[in-house]
Amino acid sequence: MDAAGLAEQITELLQLCRLLWIAIEHRDGWAAFAHWIVILLHCRARKEFFVAEPIPFRCNFMTRKVYLAGPEVFLPNAREILDRKAALAREAGLLPLSPGDLEIPHTNSKRERAAAINAVDEKMMIQADAIIANLTPFRGIAADTGTAFELGFMCASGKPVFAYTNVARDHSGRVSDLYGGAVAYDAEGRLRDPNGIAVEDFGLADNLMLHAGIERRGGVLIIGDAARDALYTDLAAFKTCLAVAVEKLR
């Protein structure tokens, strides 16, 4: 074993000792201790998952990790917006985990790269304690499909879920706008589009599986109303959602 390897093992041993002490000193600390042991072992095997944000031994032991989901990764200034959101999360006392933060392993094809990105993002969601999802309509009248998947992933994982949107008009209203207002109620009181296809009409921000799924789990979906040219850069609704998440995660 070379000097670098020995130093790494000594560092890990010291980290484990510190975690053990904290587990003894804090009520309910053993579950968290076991959680960090798993992450530490995972880090040894797959260090690329911790390139941008190492395991947070420097942070408060009980710091909550929040996965920041949203379509911002596609923006031309993605790094700027993601960094702003991450900074706000840190200021609020949370540890942000965000797609685009971490190094993607080298691959030999586009299909393999897609799978690698999916794997990295799912690993971060597994490590996260909660999610804040940006459900602002993206390339259409509904939330980004990748963000919807991530929200469902966290719901299925039994973790706290929070979300926001920068569009105040509800889902059925946006469907109506899509068809130039040509939606109408049928004889049974069901709202339908010009093709006779039913339209969800619950006054929700998006598909009921998203909005109702969040609220059923005790989360919130903050409704913002940003200017059209700032739909993905206005962080007012995000800040409100972040404040609620911090309070509920205490």
Where in the sequence are the language-model features?
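Short linear/disordered segments characteristic of secreted peptide precursors
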Residues: E8, H26-A31, R44-R46
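Aromatic (phenylalanine/tyrosine) cluster motif
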Residues: F33, F49-F50, F57, F61
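Conserved catalytic or regulatory cores that recognize and/or transform ribose-phosphate-containing ligands
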Residues: P56-R250
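Hydrophobic, low-acid, alpha-helix-prone terminal segments
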Residues: L6-C17, R27
